[in-house]
Amino acid sequence: MEQNISDELQEAFETGRWKVRKFALPNATKYIRDIDNITWAETGLIDAFGANRFFDEASQMIANSIYLFQEGFFDAAFYSLRQSIEISIGTLYLTANPEKLEKWKALEPGFESGKMVCFLKNNEPVFKDIRTKLPTFFKNLRTIQKKTNKYVHKQGFSSFYTTQSYSWSDHRENKIYSKIISDFEETVKAAIGAVAMYRLAIDPLPIILMDEELMMRSADFITQPYSEEFVAEYIGYNNIELYKQTNLYQDYKESILAHEKQN
């Protein structure tokens, strides 16, 4: 009986009354592979080791969004991308406030994303420094987040599933379809870049270890560096040069340069 119901639902969404048009995403495999840059960039810091689980979850949410989008559930896909960024914010907040972890696990209130961002901007020196030195990066991110929220909150007919079927008769369907794909690809790239940047608020090793001079003076870290291609596509070299001006990066660099090169 359950199998029959499942088959009926699948048929309804594939060809029947509730048909959802799937989206072609030629770069899906590339995005999935690129996310590995974040999962491999684990921090070894004892007081921030728990952040690894949060960044793994953020990466999972991005991967989920890519799958959901290709299946046609674009609003859920946009929501997953928004969540990937909020999860990253959450771990920065908890790393700065470890005493609040038990309350977070107990599902107590006070962990809304907006409140956590406000706290970090006003009280967490590393977070403040990064945002101050990379204003354009975060301004662009905010612009894309606002667009994402229109899909999540279903504002405007372009965020409706039914709009695609209603527009078929006047030949607007493909235009709407292409616009959703364009917006999603812009958002998935922004989400990957944002999560990667928030990871750099824990420690700068994913960037430090990209520098051969610094890498040869470094100890054996569990952290893997970001690839050149990853940085170029999702963060931008201009932004990385600005990031290198942060106190966090400079302190690590100075400490590592004090060590001799290793064979």
Task: Give a label for each model feature.
Residues 1-74, 79, 91, 101-263:
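A cross-kingdom marker of C-terminal helix-rich interaction/assembly modules
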